[in-house]
Amino acid sequence: MTAAILADALTQKVHQTEIDKELQALKEQAMVSGTEDSILVNKRQGAADLLGSLRLPHKRDEEWQFTDLSELKAIDFVAAGKVSLDVAAAENFYLPEAHQSRLVFINGFFTPELSNTNDLPSAITCQSWTNLAAHQREQLANYLGQKTDGNEVFSNLNTAGMTDSAVVWIPANTELKSPIHLLFLTVVDPTPIMVQPRLLVVVENNAQVTIAESYGAISTNCTDRPQQQPYFNNIVSEIYLGENAQVTHIRNQRDSGDSFHIATTAIAQGKQSRYRLIDVNLGAKLSRHNLQMTQQEEATKTEFLALTILAGRQVSDTHSTIALNHPHGATNQLHKCIVDEYAQAVFSGKVLVPQAAQLTNAQQLNRNLVLSSKARINTKPELQITADNVKCSHGATISQLEADEVFYLRSRGLNDYDARHLLIDAFAGEILDQIPLASLQGRLRQCVSCRTI
């Protein structure tokens, strides 16, 4: 072995040790709070044991090669504690469409005084895990922690510290007209805190529901801008659709501009089910969304629509995997990014179409609008196909505002600022127009106008 190879091996060994220590510190903080729930105790222990063989990601890892976690690793986070919050502060995040169908979690803890589920039929369960009856927890136990990637370190970190979860359980043959709002707020603290929200959604056969999942921060300044105290939001959401179930899922992330937001969303679809995700990502210094869909039976339809808007030195990374394991599946993924200043957007999307998935129709497109010469885009749409009777396509575009389009609008009387904003709003509008909740769509449109140019 040459001296150079030996030195490199020693460097990697030292680095591995450092990573293990950092993960161990996060694990210890995650497990500060205990639970007497036997179901959670068993799941926590399994994840904690698994963490012993895992490490935090590094840029040498292919799945993390464009996303540097050095800043997150350098901060000594402590487990978030319970805090009180004035109703007025939380009301800014409420959705009028879900006035009486809302669960609120502050720093990861269920807050019943800010929640309201009076509008929901008695057959529907919308509650925190700890407030469920024992027989309900037993019925849901097999869903909890089953669909996340078993070797993914951050989802295991969440499970190792799990003391509660938001739970939405829609029984068979139930169509819920009003949306359910799941609101997760972080109160910015002088000490860097780690928050680990959890969400479990079970929609049984022939049931329908719309769910809005929101993340935000309570602070004195515009929370999706920097100059806030850092915190770490580590989230796991698991969503199960029975046969012919339909779920519309609106997810919006507006964490503080100096925070870290890492989320795993795992979806399992039954026969002829329909799942639609509209994902809007605006906040956090560094955000990562691991999105996984598993087709459990045939003839499913899946739609992922996403909009990410970045400025400053923000980094946002979306990794999605759509596993089509049965025939007659249909997927459509449109991921759009608007990137300004020194920001960086990363997209890696895999669509897996094995031999069993005949007659699949899978479409994937990543479109990026770059507003600065210093902004960076890393994109990798990917199809892995072995089935021979399918209709699949994928692609990516990276563009700037077209000078001739700006000139045309200016020739119609708009100034340069308004012309550019009109084009940016139109680019974002393709996603925002799909949000079925008028109040949320309006707020996010205001954010787009505030964040661009």
UniProtKB/Swiss-Prot annotation:
Any one GO BP annotation for this protein: iron-sulfur cluster assembly
Segments forming a coiled coil: none
InterPro entries noted in UniProt: Fe-S_cluster_assembly_SufBD (IPR055346), SUF_FeS_clus_asmbl_SufBD_core (IPR000825), SUF_FeS_clus_asmbl_SufBD_sf (IPR037284), SUF_FeS_clus_asmbl_SufD (IPR011542), SufBD_N (IPR045595)
Top-level taxon: Bacteria
NCBIfam families: sufD
Family affiliation: Belongs to the iron-sulfur cluster assembly SufBD family.
Protein name: Iron-sulfur cluster assembly SufBD family protein slr0076
Species of origin: Synechocystis sp. (strain ATCC 27184 / PCC 6803 / Kazusa)
